[in-house]
């Protein structure tokens, strides 16, 4: 038994940058064929050009995961092409930070729709095919914010906490069909999402991390690879924290 993903067909939502891109790269290097879902087609095509030749086949589909119709259509197109889906990584996410008293309803709804409701759309679209195959791995990307909270992020924290609960519940529904559903909870990871934070806030975060550094997308991707592979074949309904010891 090893960590290879040769022959596996994979969808990674939000896979054109940050943690998602790190996961896509590592999966390709380990032999998987990966379709990236995102909104920015120009960025997606540039990413494909940079990743071609890494190992598996890579493609891009423009998908708004907050709309069920588009998700269903793209899952069907993926199945028409590959005839199966082995691994789904739900990584797409946005932030619309503000104190609750100043947060607009649109800021609340857009984060919940993209970060949480999208899992209902993607998972409900692929799960029947995984059930038929009696095989599959779903990896949902949450955040340590779900566990510790974050001022100014009630919408984001609520969505990420919902992902953890969703993961546990879906895992119990489909375990008998040999489908595993697990979750990642990254901490402070150097991505374009965290690059906008001011230096003082970054410094405070780093002081709280026992390992003394921010994480990288590759740090998270290696754990995702473990969950996608047969090395974790007896794991489901779990949330693996990747935060350098911040929430020990």
Curated annotation (Swiss-Prot):
Keyword match Glycosyltransferase: no
SUPFAM superfamilies: NAD(P)-binding Rossmann-fold domains
Catalytic activity reported: a (3R)-hydroxyacyl-[ACP] + NADP(+) = a 3-oxoacyl-[ACP] + NADPH + H(+)
Residues given in the record as substrate binding sites: 143
Entry binding sites for NADP(+): 14-17, 64-65, 91, 156-160, 189
Molecular function, one GO term: 3-oxoacyl-[acyl-carrier-protein] reductase (NADPH) activity
Active site: 156
InterPro entries associated with the record: 3oxo_ACP_reduc, NAD(P)-bd_dom_sf, Sc_DH/Rdtase_CS, SDR_fam
Pathway terms, separated by semicolons: Lipid metabolism; fatty acid biosynthesis
A Gene Ontology biological process term: fatty acid biosynthetic process
EC number, as in UniProt: 1.1.1.100
Enzyme class: oxidoreductase
Keywords on record: Fatty acid biosynthesis, Fatty acid metabolism, Lipid biosynthesis, Lipid metabolism, NADP, Oxidoreductase
Subunit structure: Homotetramer.
Family: Belongs to the short-chain dehydrogenases/reductases (SDR) family.
Record function comment: Catalyzes the NADPH-dependent reduction of beta-ketoacyl-ACP substrates to beta-hydroxyacyl-ACP products, the first reductive step in the elongation cycle of fatty acid biosynthesis.
Protein name listed in UniProt: 3-oxoacyl-[acyl-carrier-protein] reductase FabG
Higher taxonomy: Bacteria, Pseudomonadati, Chlamydiota, Chlamydiia, Chlamydiales
């Amino acid at each position: 038994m090893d960590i290879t993903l040769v022959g596996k067909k994979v969808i990674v939502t939000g896979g054109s940058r940050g943690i998602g891109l790190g996961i896509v790269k590592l999966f390709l290097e380990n032999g998987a064929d990966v379709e990236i879902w995102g909104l920015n087609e120009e960025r997606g095509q540039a990413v494909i050009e940079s990743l071609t030749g890494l190992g598996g086949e890579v493609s891009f589909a423009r998908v708004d995961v907050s709309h069920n119709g588009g998700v269903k259509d793209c899952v069907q197109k993926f199945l028409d092409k590959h005839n199966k889906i082995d691994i789904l990584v739900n990584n797409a996410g946005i932030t619309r930070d503000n104190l609750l008293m100043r947060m607009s309803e649109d800021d609340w709804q857009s984060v919940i729709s993209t970060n949480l409701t999208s899992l209902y759309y993607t998972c409900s679209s692929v799960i029947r095919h995984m059930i038929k195959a009696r095989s599959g791995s779903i990896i949902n990307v949450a955040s340590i914010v779900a566990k510790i909270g974050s001022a100014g992020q009630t919408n984001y924290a609520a969505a990420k906490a919902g992902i953890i609960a969703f993961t546990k519940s879906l895992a119990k529904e489909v375990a008998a069909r040999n489908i595993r559903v697990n979750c990642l909870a990254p901490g402070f990871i150097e991505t374009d999402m965290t690059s906008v934070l001011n230096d003082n806030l970054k410094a405070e975060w780093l002081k709280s991390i026992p390992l003394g550094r921010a994480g990288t997308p590759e740090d998270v991707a290696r754990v995702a690879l473990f969950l996608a592979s047969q090395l974790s074949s007896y794991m489901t309904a779990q949330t693996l924290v990747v935060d350098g010891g911040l929430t020990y």
